[in-house]
Amino acid sequence: PLRVCGMVKKENHPGGGPFWVKGENGEITKQVVETAQVNLSDNNQLKILEEASHFSPVDFICGVKDYRGNHFDLEKFSNPDTGLITTKSKDGKELKALELPGLWNGGMYYWLTVFVEVPKITFNPVKEINDLLKPEHQPLIS
């Protein structure tokens, strides 16, 4: 399968970014990596993350059929070992949670991947409730 991932220039927005990743068997793949997947106590990893030029607004175009029109068995192209431990809260109590591989974090691990820069105007995130107050999320009134 093929994924073309739109990336915008990084301007202090949270989110994953395009990185080369070395797997356990030494294979090198292109991945969208979330901050939670990075060992922030490793200065080398932190430097790579901080110097990244782009991040992913999650604009993907996906090809899920082969050249004969047959659907790929997408499970064969995922990496079940890419789950991560994150911190969540419930009733004011901090909890650790095991997150299974996400769609682009592990579910598309072995896909052919192309990163392309897209215009910033395509990026209108809603990461928190106040983002809905921004002009780009308001209805057009004529």
Locations of the language-model features?
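OB-fold and OB-like single-stranded nucleic-acid-recognition modules
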Residues: P1-S142
